Amino acid sequence: MNSNEKAINSLSRRVTSEVAMALLCLALTFIFFHSAVFPRTKTFLGGYDNTYQYYPWMHKLADDWRALTPPLWDFSVEAGFPFPGEWQTAAFYPINILYVWLTGIPTPVKLDVLILFHFAAAMWGMSLFLRRRGVKRWPSLFGGAVFCWIGPVAIRASWQANIFVGLIYLPWVLYFFERGLAAKNAWRSSWTGLAGLALALSLLAGHPQPFIHNSLMLGFFAVFLLFEKRTPGLSWTINLWRVASALLTVAVIAFLFTYIQLASSHEYFARAYRWIGLSNPVKALQTVVPLEIYNRNNLSIPDLVSIYTGHSSAAEGGTLYLTITALVCACFGLGVPGTWRWFALTITGFILLVALAGNTTPFGWLAYRLPLLNMVREPVRILYLYQFCFATLAASGLQMALNGIPQRGGRFTIFVIVISIFACEARQNGSSWWASTNSPFTADQAYRKTPLITFLEERNRADPGMYRVLARPKDLIPPNSGDIFPLSTVLGHRSSMLIAYFDLLSRDWSLSSQALDQVGARYVVTDKPSEGLTFLSSFDGLLLYERPAARAVFRWSGSPDQAGSGTIGAVNWQRNGVNLQIATNQPRKLTFAEINYPGWHVRINGVATAIDSRWPHFMSVTVPSGTSTVQWSYRPWWLTPGMCCWLLGAVILTAMKLSALRERH
């Protein structure tokens, strides 16, 4: 057997072994979380954001991408908004796109399975990282379980799936980066490029927080490797340049793959308020969180004992409990020789100080003023980095214990016993974060087609997209219902809102508001009788009213009486545009009650026509006399450059890999 055949056989064995490891992670994940699959009694889609954001937005994403059309604009919520601009929609996350292509329009069951695949990826990535750090196969699996089966990571899956998905890329980023740094030319190693791709995916998954904290941890890890992997005989300057150039490669690759998201979100946030549930919303590009908000969701000093009691009063998954089994193993891990334990302890201490926020003086004051960290609204969200460090120590501790057992079968038996006890503890103390499939707050129950929804659908079919529904309170119909059912709502559930739309509604929130007339709020769902409205029907205690003064979404400016049939004809709604036929005996201004936003274009009878931008709220255009076809389309400037950046990033990664193969031969 020649050297080439030996190399091929060796590679084949490694690939086969790693595929088996990945399948084992998948199997263990599905066994541990079996209640989400069979028999399906629990679901991850029970938290408010998962039910009312993640589920309907995945519907919108699937509907558009399955038609090979990027989901650029959402007509169904508020007066329309740029769908990718609100980055929690994860409109350009490749895994979501591939999944809906393969499985179709998502159901709660399908999304639970997608979340489980990410759990398995987290476990596998953690195992790879730990094995790279010298931990054996079975303890590395245990470390992967500690990282994601309980604690801040698992809790986030039930509350905000898009944040959870971003968290799981942390071990992958560090694993790829360490492998890249071991290459001869770290800055052009394909492993370093993959670290940049993994970091980019943590942003594309739908939230900036994992990207910020993953980047922070990568920086800490790079400094650690600078000292641990320093090449003897080389100056500090050369070693520093080696690490810095690798980080630069990661940054460039990450930028190329996230550019499309960053560009769309920057354009949107420049025109939006953030945290609209607050009494005084802030401009979305105000990246530093107000101090009173920053100190609202943090750990308290008594919460520190949750490491063994499991009880914490902190919101947002602010717990230190990762089971007694893992705690004992982590204590053993502190006895493992080497510098990693000191690095893990140092990072853990830093993370706890940040999570305590205003409860520590003066560090809380200092942490609030640290760049990047003060961009995250809830300091406790950084605790998954504590969980990561804890998991590495637990895996090292189990490794040390297994090293004392000479028989291979004995080591495997102890591993099975330890991970089984850990799984029982995690199920007992972590399963309460799941929601029962019978809960009215789950996506299964919240988006059932009720008689009220059916009635509103029928009204919408009579005038497609011409009027909107207002619910008071807004949860009387599921927020973002328009992404699932054919209807449009005045309000949705998002953390931000376009300033022009917010300011328009804020003029008068009463049901007789002229602002509601302007946005086309014709139907009102309420739980209390309302004077001055036309009663239509009642549905299970909910009252449906009609607002006769509501203007249609398409109308003639300044003349409500001329919006009848024969003047504005059939409206054909498309995924990122709308076409309509109109007829008028003189030139008139046609108003489209959709928010005036960059990227909209109009053609009248095939001729490009300027949009009147004097009115900041809605769009209008002057149409000539006679019969005309008006075509509105949303084509943002950043789409083509963003796709080109994706392509360029893929080309660079491919070139890196081919270069490595040539050097090897």
Located regions from the model:
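Start-transfer (signal-anchor) and selected internal transmembrane alpha helices
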Residues: 1-36, 238, 242-251, 411-418, ...
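Membrane-interface helix-loop junctions at the exits of transmembrane helices
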Residues: 30-40, 65, 94-109, 138-160, ...
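Membrane-embedded helix bundles of polyisoprenyl
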Residues: 25-28, 121-133, 137-228, 243-265, ...
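Active-site lumenal/periplasmic loops and adjacent helix-entry segments of GT-C-fold
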Residues: 35-133, 138-169, 286-294, 302, ...
